Structure formats: structure tokens, C-alpha cells
Amino acid sequence: MAELLKWYVDSGVDVALEDAPVNRLDQAPPEAAPASAPPATERSGAAGPPPRQRPDQKLVSREETHQSAREAAAKAANIEELRAALDAFDGCPLKETAKNLVFGDGDPKADLMFVGEAPGAEEDRQGLPFVGPAGHLLDKMLEAIGQSRGDVYITNILPWRPPGNRSPTDAEIAACLPFIERHIELVGPKILVMVGGTSAKTLLGITQGIMRLRGKWLSYESVHMASPIEARAILHPAYLLRQPAQKRETWLDLLEIRANLETGA
């Protein structure tokens, strides 16, 4: 008997045989498990998802934001009041994610004013414009034409950093536009240098790219200024760090800016 059991085990039989034959094909199928109860639904009186905002509602909201910005900027009689107005302005969502307001740096009565696009990570940390790698290159560019950061005035279209250094949206630019326009009016520079394509297109209200705008004198106008300001568009230092071969073109722009400052032409 022991030898028979051993043979069964060696053959792979690991269950005991029934005393009587069993027709397993004739067995009733196992009962199906009861269906799980559907997830509980909200009570009929519970609030559903918020209704979608209609496009016309968004447009009205944006116009109200722009109007609020225009009114706040117009009330600023000097640079300090404009900074306070921007600090109190809640119409741009970038303020919620930024660490600091990046307002401006340099001489607010300078003949030469630089306007970039938006702060980067280092600018956001320090609360000053153009202090990262691109800012260091801008400092060298200024030195090359006999200027320093203290001789000029530097700011941006946007005073708050977009998350992840992404490009600003049209809505964000529109919300901040009245403030940069008032900023330029209060500084009243002899020459306005628009740093990068976003700055140039925003301030001039055009769609041409920076490569078509650089290399020539332009004109910046404001309804609140007695006369237009001579303007120049240059490649952004951040772009020059990525494309150093373009530094020559920017150097030619800087030479013309210097000549204009020296001769008053």
C-alpha cells in the first residue's frame, strides 16, 4: 500500500480519490457572487459641479480687471505711489504664486530705460529685475557702452514671475499693462529699450517678431505723454546666452543707442 501511495505521489496525484465515481460535468455551477452595491450617490439636494463660466462672463471680468488697473495706475503721481499701487493690486493671479514683487532698479530719472518681459527665479527671490544669468550679461552690455545699472532704469512688463518661467499669457499681460505704461510715463526716459520680443510687441501694440523690429529706431507713444519717446528693440540677454552668435547684432544696436545718448540725435 505504501508503495502504491508513493507511485501516486511520484505521478503527481496529490488528492485522495472518492469512494464512488463523481461526474463533475454534472455539478451545478457555483452561485454567482451578489453584485456589489453601486456607489452612493449624492443626495438630490446636494450641489453639483459649478456651472461653466460663459465666454462673455470672462470678457467682462477681464475688462473689469483692466479698468481697475488703469484707475490704480493713473492715480500714482510718482514711482513710490506706483509701487504701492502694484503691491495692492490683486487683478493678476501671478501675484499669488510669486515670492516678491519685482518693481524696478536703477535711477528713476535716467535717460535710458530698459523694459524686459518678466522676472525669473533669481529675480523672484531677490525682488529685483535682471539679477540672474541674463542680468549679469545685461550688466556687461551696459558697461560696454559706458553705462552701469545705477545710470539706467530697469523694469519688466510683468512685476511677478510666471510659474516655472513659462511665457506670460495675454490675460496676465493685459492686467499689468496699465502699470508699465504709467511706469514709463513717470520715468520719462529719452530712449526706451525694449528687451525681447514680448516687451516690444506689448509696448508697441504690434505683432512683428523681434528679428524684424531690432536694428532700427522705433517710436513709443502714450496719450499721457507730450511727445513720443525714441525706442529700440534688442534681443533678450537670455536668448544671447543660448545663441551667442547673435551678440554681434546686439552690439550694433548698443552702439547706436550710445551714439544717440552722446549726440542727442
Question: What does each of the following model-derived ranges do?
Answer:
Residues 2, 7-10, 14-26, 30-265:
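A polyanion-binding, active-site-adjacent surface
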